[in-house]
């Protein structure tokens, strides 16, 4: 019994790509979003839809708050939208995530990925 448990643990811990990207990564978010996108209008009834939306909204709010804090403190800002709360549509965000190379996307947080998408949309002219 003990050997079976150890073998199962070794198999699952040795092959994380087979299980998908770890939670919280940009790749995990994109995988879940693409799964919902494939459902078409029925995606709105999937329980993961609300979680994805809340996750993206929370990350966006955090980035906006960071930008406001940077402006107030006189630090350089990381993206240059006309307002601190940048506009980013859901499909625009998903397409931006897909444009990030898979190797990088698998190792970056959703916040880092969203910042990269915002920097591409709203580059700073320095």
What are these regions (language model features)?
Residues 58, 62, 98-109:
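Short, highly charge-biased, low-complexity peptide segments
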Residues 1-4:
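Positively charged n-region of N-terminal signal peptides that target proteins for export
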Residues 104-126:
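C-terminal partner/receptor-binding element of secreted or periplasmic proteins
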Residues 13-15:
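N-terminal signal peptide c-region/cleavage motif recognized by signal peptidases
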Residues 9-10, 39:
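Enrichment for repetitive, rod-forming helical segments
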Residues 7-8, 17-18:
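Cleavable N-terminal signal peptides
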